[in-house]
From Swiss-Prot:
Organism field: Mycobacterium tuberculosis (strain ATCC 25618 / H37Rv)
Protein's gene: mycP1
UniProt protein name: Mycosin-1
Disulfide bonds, paired cysteine numbers: none
Location of region: Disordered: 24-43
A biological-process GO annotation: symbiont-mediated perturbation of host process
Annotated knockout phenotype: Deletion mutant fails to secrete EsxA and EspB and replicates poorly in mice.
One GO term describing the cellular component: plasma membrane
Amino acid sequence: MHRIFLITVALALLTASPASAITPPPIDPGALPPDVTGPDQPTEQRVLCASPTTLPGSGFHDPPWSNTYLGVADAHKFATGAGVTVAVIDTGVDASPRVPAEPGGDFVDQAGNGLSDCDAHGTLTASIIAGRPAPTDGFVGVAPDARLLSLRQTSEAFEPVGSQANPNDPNATPAAGSIRSLARAVVHAANLGVGVINISEAACYKVSRPIDETSLGASIDYAVNVKGVVVVVAAGNTGGDCVQNPAPDPSTPGDPRGWNNVQTVVTPAWYAPLVLSVGGIGQTGMPSSFSMHGPWVDVAAPAENIVALGDTGEPVNALQGREGPVPIAGTSFAAAYVSGLAALLRQRFPDLTPAQIIHRITATARHPGGGVDDLVGAGVIDAVAALTWDIPPGPASAPYNVRRLPPPVVEPGPDRRPITAVALVAVGLTLALGLGALARRALSRR
């Protein structure tokens, strides 16, 4: 009871912020984008598809460390995700008997259906969420009986037709995937009747140079408050536009989460508590050095030395880097573990609202010493505790400012490019490959 009280008190700070500090933008439901699949503009494939691999000497007979750390096997005594549908908004999924994803739509290729992963990313996240077991190895997803829908929303392999690559700045090269298309993908997934949406992507921009993301905010509000979907998002990885945020200033006790110190906004992560924002940890339980900090981080989960299922349905633990295979890592995969847990909870507690599912995950997390911080939020998730603890359900809806807003005014001038362009990254891909040049440029809604 003492632990629950500490978490409940600390969670009040997750959404509290000084009036003078930066806060997530108010949501305008009137900015909801249409439910239309397809890319923002015609695209073409420019790069060969990537495939995951394995590190030398790897063995997969035992469960991955992350499953053991989170108690996944014990959690399956209470729920397996049966009857729950999870939408994976990512780079697509290569379906296999062990990752039996179904087509949910394609926002990269007009002729696609979501069941193609040229980036070796969406398949990995989907397998962590709901990969099926096999007698040949110890891998199993968090919610192995959940239904998977794949929505391909971004890809490094595709670019707008006629776009020109910049050999001196690959980050400036247009690629498929934008905040506009992400917003449409969220609406489409919600309308397909899913119970959980996983978004292992992040866009970062400076506080001093905000972007127009009204369509994304409206789509998240629609998914959560209208369609009743739990939306889980990655906190993001450092690199490129994602410059690490400083720690809260201890001399300002009125700002315990450090809203006044935020320098880099991460979206859609900063829409917490409407979404569940997930940071990363390593095998020691310490926060991952690459995991973006912020007052919006809600919980954490494993993000290093990840084992998943590849395009053939076999275990993998590496991606090809410049100098050979490198371990799979990133907050993408931390988010996938939490989405799997959300699916278990939706099966076990079908009457709980999205806000109450999120409350159960955060209230039962292994909280840090101070109860909550900007690295791991309320702490590392505890699957069995979330499924079994007797705790109050919490408020039916998350406190969030939803109101109709006037159209945003974009000031012309020398800073116009930073205002209208951000990097939308599948958070895990860039880090794992060790190639900063893989960060994609994506236009926000003007």
